[in-house]
């Protein structure tokens, strides 16, 4: 019986492949990369960029039973995602996406529709509410508390990645639930860590490439389902508490706002009504998209500054000049980047070299379209190679080097695409940029960053499956500025 089932699935897969080829006949398609060994490359975004030398900035790859189009230049990415955004606003619905998204109620993983547009409007309005009211002072307050905790560890090796992760999780907890209690922060932090670790496992990635594998035993899939049950239990508890205590017409946080708006907000006529499940998944998106991504970018920034102490010194001089010496005092002028040009340029350079999501989540065409003269049929999966676009030698001078000064000359360098662009641009970009500027500014005002035991962290991305461009674990020593002696264990 098992053999018969395998044979049937093989026949169906072959029929689907032949049907797909028949539908593409007569089209002027991008060139196809033969074979599938490219998927085994440890640094896939750079490998995909290298293929442009022979094939140009747009080509097709064979991914399981289907072809996908890869975009490797800023020009092709913006043509698709900005100028033809409706054509490329879709999202392919893979087995893991369906499972993680609470049956298509997620914003990041949801397919393009009128209901999706209403969901986006709800989440964006809640974020804008946070920016107008409490977001800015909250980030500064929690960052100041973070620096005080770090001061207690001065002179000893600090696992800064975990500290950044807890800080960003505390910010999201407070904005979403109006609470930064340590127990809740650690609960959500551990939940997100477990979910991302499970979702990025190779067995789940293979399930999305070859969907019929879901009919076979998969321990990785079982672990993912348990992680999702834990996630939903935690979020549902918070939603239930908010519904029991909120006052109509008033909102304490983003969850209050979304719960009260979800019953009334509709998109264009005929889209249907948003459900509480959409609020549930907006909360999930805020934690998954707003904690590890920002924390990882901050960790990359610290690593680059450890390798480039001359840049760190210039940043501290800029901060002292504009804000005055000391770890507190003047607020960070994040709304006016001209006051802290080197800090803004450093953030841009870190985002260019190490976009946390180097290969953007796959898009899907909603109707037949074209890119650079090539036909792109309806339903085609399209993947923007953001890191590849940031390392394009035809656009950037010496792209592999860490050179924040490239952004100091107005108009000399294009805007980075680390947060995507078009209809699918990251809604949390304003919050992420605020956190990056405030945390780095306060950290560098309070401390000088030094390598633990004189060992510099690796700047090579960690080889792993998944979405995020993670880094090797490392430690840093924080020397309080103005301290007359070196901290314990510090090397001159």
UniProtKB/Swiss-Prot annotation:
GO terms for biological process: organic acid metabolic process; steroid biosynthetic process; steroid metabolic process; xenobiotic metabolic process. Its cofactor is heme b. Its EC number is 1.14.14.16. Its main location: endoplasmic reticulum. InterPro entries: Cyt_P450, Cyt_P450_CS, Cyt_P450_E_grp-I, Cyt_P450_sf. Gene3D superfamilies: Cytochrome P450 (1.10.630.10). Heme b binds at residues 91, 120, 363, 424, 426. One of its GO terms (cellular component) is endoplasmic reticulum membrane. SUPFAM superfamilies: Cytochrome P450. Progesterone binds at residue 231. It catalyses: 17alpha-hydroxyprogesterone + reduced [NADPH--hemoprotein reductase] + O2 = 11-deoxycortisol + oxidized [NADPH--hemoprotein reductase] + H2O + H(+); progesterone + reduced [NADPH--hemoprotein reductase] + O2 = 21-hydroxyprogesterone + oxidized [NADPH--hemoprotein reductase] + H2O + H(+). It is found in: Endoplasmic reticulum membrane; Microsome membrane. GO terms for molecular function: 17-hydroxyprogesterone 21-hydroxylase activity; heme binding; iron ion binding; oxidoreductase activity, acting on paired donors, with incorporation or reduction of molecular oxygen, reduced flavin or flavoprotein as one donor, and incorporation of one atom of oxygen; progesterone 21-hydroxylase activity; steroid binding; steroid hydroxylase activity. Specifically catalyzes the 21-hydroxylation of steroids. Required for the adrenal synthesis of mineralocorticoids and glucocorticoids. The leucine-rich hydrophobic amino acid N-terminal region probably helps to anchor the protein to the microsomal membrane. This is Steroid 21-hydroxylase. It comes from Canis lupus familiaris (Dog).
């Amino acid at each position: 019986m098992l053999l018969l089932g395998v044979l049937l699935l093989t026949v169906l897969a072959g029929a689907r492949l032949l049907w797909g080829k028949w539908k593409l006949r007569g089209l002027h398609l991008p060139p196809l990369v033969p074979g599938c060994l490219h998927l085994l490359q440890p640094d896939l975004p750079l490998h995909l960029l290298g293929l442009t030398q022979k094939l140009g900035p747009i080509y097709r790859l064979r991914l399981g039973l289907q072809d996908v189009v890869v975009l490797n230049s800023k020009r092709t990415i913006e043509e698709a995602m900005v100028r033809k955004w409706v054509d490329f606003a879709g999202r392919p619905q893979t087995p893991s996406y369906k499972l993680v998204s609470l049956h298509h109620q997620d914003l990041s993983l949801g397919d393009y529709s009128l209901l999706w547009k209403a969901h986006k409007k709800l989440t964006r309005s809640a974020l804008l509410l946070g920016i107008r009211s409490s977001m800015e002072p909250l980030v500064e307050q929690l960052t100041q508390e973070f620096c005080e905790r770090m001061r207690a560890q001065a002179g000893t090796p600090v696992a800064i990645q975990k500290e950044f992760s807890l800080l960003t999780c505390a910010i999201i907890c407070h904005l979403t639930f109006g609470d930064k209690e340590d127990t809740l922060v650690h609960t959500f932090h551990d939940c997100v860590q477990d979910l991302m670790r499970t979702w990025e496992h190779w067995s789940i990635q293979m399930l999305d490439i070859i969907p019929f594998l879901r009919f076979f035993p998969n321990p990785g899939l079982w672990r993912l389902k348990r992680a999702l049950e834990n996630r939903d239990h935690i979020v549902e508890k918070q939603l239930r508490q908010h519904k029991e205590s909120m006052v109509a017409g008033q909102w304490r946080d983003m969850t209050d706002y979304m719960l009260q708006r979800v019953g009334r907000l509709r998109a264009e006529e005929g889209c249907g009504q948003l459900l509480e499940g959409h609020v549930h998944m907006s909360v999930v998106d805020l934690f998954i998209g707003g904690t590890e991504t920002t924390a990882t970018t901050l960790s990359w920034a610290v690593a680059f500054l450890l390798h480039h102490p001359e840049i760190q010194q210039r940043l501290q001089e800029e901060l002292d000049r504009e804000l005055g010496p000391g770890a507190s005092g003047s607020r960070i002028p994040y709304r006016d980047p001209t006051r802290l040009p080197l800090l803004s340029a450093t953030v841009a350079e870190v985002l260019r070299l190490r976009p946390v999501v180097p290969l953007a989540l796959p898009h899907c065409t909603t109707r037949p379209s074209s890119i650079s003269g090539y036909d792109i049929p309806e339903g085609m999966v399209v993947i923007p190679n953001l890191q590849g676009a940031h390392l394009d030698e035809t656009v950037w001078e010496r792209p592999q080097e860490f050179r924040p000064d490239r952004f100091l000359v107005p108009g000399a360098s294009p805007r980075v695409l680390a947060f995507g662009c078009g209809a699918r641009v990251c809604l949390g970009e304003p919050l992420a940029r605020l956190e990056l500027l405030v945390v780095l500014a306060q950290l560098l005002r309070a401390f000088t960053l030094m390598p633990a035991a004189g060992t510099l962290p690796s700047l090579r991305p960690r080889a792993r499956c998944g979405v995020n461009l993670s880094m090797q674990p490392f430690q840093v020593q924080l020397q309080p500025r103005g301290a007359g002696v070196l901290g314990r264990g510090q090397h001159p």
